[in-house]
Amino acid sequence: MAVIAMMMTISASAQFYIYFSDGSVARVDSISTVAPAPATNPGAFSVSETKKVTFSPGNLQYIRSTDTWVFASTQYEMVGTDNVTGGIEEFDGPRGIVRYGDDLADKIDLFGFSTSGTNFGVSTSKYFPDYGGSCVDWGTNQIGSDAPNTWRVLTSSEWFYLYYYRANASELMGIAQVNGVNGLIILPDDWTCPADVTFKSGYNSDESGIEKYADYQSFTLEQWSKLEAAGAVFLPAGGYRDASHVIFVQLEGCYWSSTEESMSSSRTFYFVSFEAACLTSMRNGGLSVRLVKDL
């Protein structure tokens, strides 16, 4: 027996009537609003045996002229070679899409390692001591309208757990091209693929190449919207910045962790078309930053 309508008579003493599909009517004296039980978060990702996180809606960006931090407007947005000014964007084979520029652009999304002395890695310095000291998490900034410390960067062990140790980890990652952008899709713990979209986990077994992402699988914007609504995360292959030179765009993604390894290096999460791994990068390299929120 289904409810087909509910009507209210306006008076000093309100009366509510519920009409059922079998023709019966019931009167109730009042209605109280009860909040529904929260649904399972489709974007929950285990990063340890006891901790889950949700990912930010896009990669971190910094606007130099206004000294503001924001998230990319979409998960597949990346600044790419426009992180620098000057030079010409070109394809350089094993280095992917490159630009050998002159200086940082106003909007950037490739950062050196964040410490107190480097303004969160917004620097073209190649001098390792400039990036020395303990990590200062990018999430300590106000990002968009979010208060400081709403977001944080994963540790290296959390990246590794997400990539390797969580249940069915190998089935919950796969390279892809989304709306023309190469990258890595990461699926939440409790994943149900939309009925009219096919997702293939894993990597292209061939050697690295820009075209290998789309060769493996490609999603239109409409298809990606369905995957995203189901909780999927996309990390763009945003490349690498060496001072004012940007290389490896659309070829590889490299994301900082908050874990320091030495005065000159820190731990990262890295992927190309044929693999993903937790590696080490020199602190003066400009890498992508994706933040998370603890659940």
Enumerate the predicted regions with their spans.
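Sec-dependent signal peptide recognition
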Residues: 1-3
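Residue-level detector of intrinsically disordered terminal segments
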Residues: 5-7
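Glycine-centered tight beta-turn/hairpin loop motif at sheet-sheet or coil-to-beta transitions
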Residues: 21-24, 50-52
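Structured surface patches comprising rigid loops and adjacent beta-strands/short helices at the edges
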Residues: 28-36
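Short aromatic-cysteine micro-motif
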Residues: 41-53, 57-174, 178-179, 250, ...
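C-terminal, surface-exposed recognition/capping segments
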Residues: 50, 57-64, 140, 152-295
